[in-house]
Amino acid sequence: MRRIASLALLMTAVSASAFAGDYDALISAIKKTWPDKHNVAVVCDQGGSKGNVQILASAASGMKIMLIDVKGPQDMGKALGTLTAQKPDVVVLVNGDRVAGDGSTAATFLIQRMANIKVPVAATTEAGVKQGAVVGVGPSTGGKLLVNPKAAMLSGVAVPEGGTAI
């Protein structure tokens, strides 16, 4: 039993370090492309995505992180109300989040509503960029910076240089 626990801890540490690099690259792209954007919002199931949120917060040093906890799709309306009132500079999707992660219907809802109020969304997956995130870099992108020019136009922001358009 002890070996299984050690193996699980090792796997968590390895996957956490992989995520750290992914969020580092994403935050770096955000800071480089939009240097005036310092307030980052994250909408996720806080309990289920706690590790990823901590890693993201570490990567986003010097930026203010606003965490909006959602337990299910029924909470997305309240989350949108908070986002509309607080109007963050950018929203980052948490890959793998069971409620609002890349590829989910809640993420699509969030991306569309954020574009309406000119707030760009960033992701770590190709799925997130295809859904309408302006920028994405992470494991599913092979480390390549992916951009969505249409989403950038709708959100009123510049397209990151050197990205591959989707």
Residue ranges: model-predicted function:
Residues 16-166:
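Short hydrophobic alpha-helices and adjacent helix-cap/hinge residues
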Residues 4-14:
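Sec-dependent N-terminal signal peptides
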